[in-house]
């Protein structure tokens, strides 16, 4: 909308005595230009009309519902809140452990990084592309004992904490290998007697899963997912045999 910036823009229309708020998502309503997106007259008319009635990209939200959602003005938080999955469970019921990665400063990382190949590596957000972790992760000289709890276990689910779309991967860690995750990542150890990590990844990367993550996202400039919201996310959990079949097809 504005030249020279990619920061999302929100507009608030204020009035008195309301018991509800109509939220409108116009993020996909524009004409793409070479250097800058623009609103056509038709786009503007569509947005104005959306402020008057519920539709595909607008919804009237009660003050009570706003309060329950921490007064978030992100429409995706209120879409399909009544979605029901067959065999749906809370995410925390299949999690053995969840932690954020290590919050290391740039100077700390400079001291830790090794020019030589070692059995210790560092995983950053940029090392995850298209759901796959880069095999050529930076090597580390050593991992301080205090940081050991931030190391990734084999088959851990890795989820980016910030940014959209969120990045998701399953880590493969060899017996003698140590991988330290950074603070922008959630490291999720699943109970594999209940859930196949690749099945959970497949769900979170599906249209339904992406929508579910959007509903628990807060912030517009830098979208992020809070750990409590993540733990209470509802995921469909069929029998393990069916999960394994889906995971095999997905990783194909």
Descriptions of predicted regions:
Residues 50-109, 232-252:
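Non-catalytic DNA-recognition/assembly elements of restriction-modification systems
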Residues 2-5, 131-132, 149, 177-179:
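Short glycine/serine/proline-enriched coil/turn segments at secondary-structure junctions
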Residues 37, 92-111, 126-154:
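Sequence-specific dsDNA recognition surfaces
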Residues 2-75, 79-85:
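Flexible, glycine-/basic-rich loop-and-beta segments that form/coincide
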Residues 124, 143-205:
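A short beta-sheet element
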Residues 12, 76, 115, 178-186, ...:
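A short glycine-rich beta-alpha junction/loop motif
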Residues 1-4, 112-114:
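AMP-binding (ANL) adenylation modules
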Residues 108-109, 115, 121-124, 200:
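PDZ/PDZ-like peptide-tail recognition elements
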